[in-house]
Amino acid sequence: MKTLLRPAVSLFVLLTAVTGVVYPLAVTGIAKVTFPEAADGSLIVKDGKTVGSSLIGQNFSDPKYFWGRPSATSPMPYNASSSSGSNQGPLNPALVDAVKVRIEALKAADPDNKLPIPADLVNASASGLDPHISPEAAAYQVTRVAGQRHLLPADVKALVSQHTEGRQWGVFGEPRVNVLQLNIALDSVSK
């Protein structure tokens, strides 16, 4: 029995040290050298204070800000520790009701807006934490944000254009706008 126990415990301790200490430290060290900003969570710092991450959406509900995609995390929106999709199918009555409520909220916030509401403003992303919206979703909100901030819509459109990211490596994905970065830029312009 002792002849089996000693190698088993030794192997357990060795593998725990390698997989629990050495490997994570090595990967973190390599990441900090090769991708220093991303290794720390792509944090956005404004005036010496961390205001969020460029990788995780935030809940903006004030009409003077651009709003991101709805969050699928519960019970608290945009909770990174409970990232998941809603898993509701397109015919699920709960999803249909949620989308109707979101459409009404968008219409109530900007009743004069007659543009079609982009799908990403009423549907959550697969992770429930997407920090981006489409340029169309940003364009839909320009008049509301400009009016709330007493800015010219053309100036707000220009800001949206400046913060529109292209396809990943020019090939993958679609153009997108990071909502947090756009709202930070808006705050800088509005001061």
UniProtKB/Swiss-Prot annotation:
Topology with respect to the bilayer: Single-pass membrane protein
InterPro entries per the UniProt record, alphabetical: KdpC
Main subcellular localisation: membrane
Pfam families: KdpC
Family: Belongs to the KdpC family.
First and last residue of the signal peptide: none
Any one GO molecular-function label of the UniProt entry: P-type potassium transmembrane transporter activity
Cystines in this chain: none
Protein name in the entry: Potassium-transporting ATPase KdpC subunit
Subunit annotation: The system is composed of three essential subunits: KdpA, KdpB and KdpC.
Amino-acid biosynthesis in keyword set: no
Its job: Part of the high-affinity ATP-driven potassium transport (or Kdp) system, which catalyzes the hydrolysis of ATP coupled with the electrogenic transport of potassium into the cytoplasm. This subunit acts as a catalytic chaperone that increases the ATP-binding affinity of the ATP-hydrolyzing subunit KdpB by the formation of a transient KdpB/KdpC/ATP ternary complex.
Organism: Dechloromonas aromatica (strain RCB)
The entry's keywords: ATP-binding, Cell inner membrane, Cell membrane, Ion transport, Membrane, Nucleotide-binding, Potassium, Potassium transport, Transmembrane, Transmembrane helix, Transport
Xref: NCBIfam families: kdpC (TIGR00681), PRK00315.1 (NF001454)
Compartments where found: Cell inner membrane
Chaperone as UniProt keyword: no
Stretches that traverse the bilayer: 11-31
GO cellular component: plasma membrane
